[in-house]
């Protein structure tokens, strides 16, 4: 079993009098792939922001890649973390080309300036873009891409700095069925890659959980309903308590989950 990548101890987050997270105890190890699932407003994105050193807890302690938040240079720490999120996509300069968007992740910046990239950086960026099925888009502007293409390019960017931790905030949100299935399949391949970093994926749809994910946390109103190995956590009872409605849960032969009301 690998070393510890994330550790939350009694973590709470409050903003404007509202409790966004309540007493979260959680740890992620190097060889684990976690999905965080729950309804809208459950605290999933807040949890990911804390894990990505983008937000400090109001109470409790957080260790990210062996560094304690509040006692570390977070700008340096963030270079060791890959992040793909809608908030990041909104900050991309409209004329940014796909190749440049991926390359600039080496410096944890957006927008090409005067920085220099060697042949190794360019080769890695091209390989990642190709791995995510976007080789034909390499010279396109990010603003001209479809939603599915943007999601895949964001993941290539998140992987560019060879991160020790990969955070994916609702990567399949806004995709049609074909786009979602293509992305989930690619993420499943990444999850099963022994060389891939530790992963934490946020979603509120169980059908978006890629095969190969090993652990799950179910969140409701900022509190953990259940967490641990995915086979023990993903039950109809746990899912029904998380979403507040009776749900049946099925799993296909390829390891994918599907929920339906009953």
Residue spans for each PLM region:
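Helix-to-loop junction immediately C-terminal to a conserved catalytic motif
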Residues: 52
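Conserved ABC transporter NBD signature motif
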Residues: 60-70
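Conserved catalytic motifs of ABC-family nucleotide-binding domains
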Residues: 162
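Catalytic Walker B motif of ABC-type/P-loop ATPase nucleotide-binding domains
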Residues: 166-170
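H-loop (His-switch) and adjacent beta-strand-loop-beta switch element
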Residues: 216-229
């Amino acid at each position: 079993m690998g070393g510890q990548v994330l550790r939350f101890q009694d973590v709470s987050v409050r903003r404007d009098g509202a409790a966004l997270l309540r007493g979260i105890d959680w740890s992620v190890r190097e060889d684990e792939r976690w999905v965080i699932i729950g309804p809208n407003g459950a605290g999933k994105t807040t949890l990911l922001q804390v894990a990505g050193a983008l937000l400090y807890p109001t109470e409790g302690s957080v260790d990210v890649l062996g560094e304690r938040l509040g006692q570390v240079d977070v700008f340096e720490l963030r270079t060791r973390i890959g992040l793909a999120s809608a908030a990041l996509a909104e900050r991309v300069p409209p004329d940014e080309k796909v190749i440049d968007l991926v390359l600039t992740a080496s410096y944890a910046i957006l927008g090409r300036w005067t920085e220099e990239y060697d042949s190794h950086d360019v080769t890695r960026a091209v390989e990642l873009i190709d791995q995510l099925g976007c080789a034909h888009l390499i010279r396109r502007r990010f603003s001209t891409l479809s939603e599915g293409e943007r999601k895949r390019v964001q993941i290539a960017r998140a992987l560019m700095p060879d991160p020790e931790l990969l955070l994916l905030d609702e990567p399949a949100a806004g995709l049609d069925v074909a786009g979602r299935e293509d992305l989930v399949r690619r993420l499943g391949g990444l999850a099963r890659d022994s060389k891939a970093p530790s992963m934490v994926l946020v979603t509120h749809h169980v059908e978006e959980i890629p095969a190969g994910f090993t652990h799950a946390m179910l969140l409701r109103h900022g509190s953990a309903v259940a967490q641990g190995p995915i086979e023990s956590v993903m039950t109809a009872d746990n899912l029904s308590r998380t979403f507040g409605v009776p749900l049946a849960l099925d799993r296909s032969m390829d390891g994918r989950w599907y929920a339906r009301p009953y």
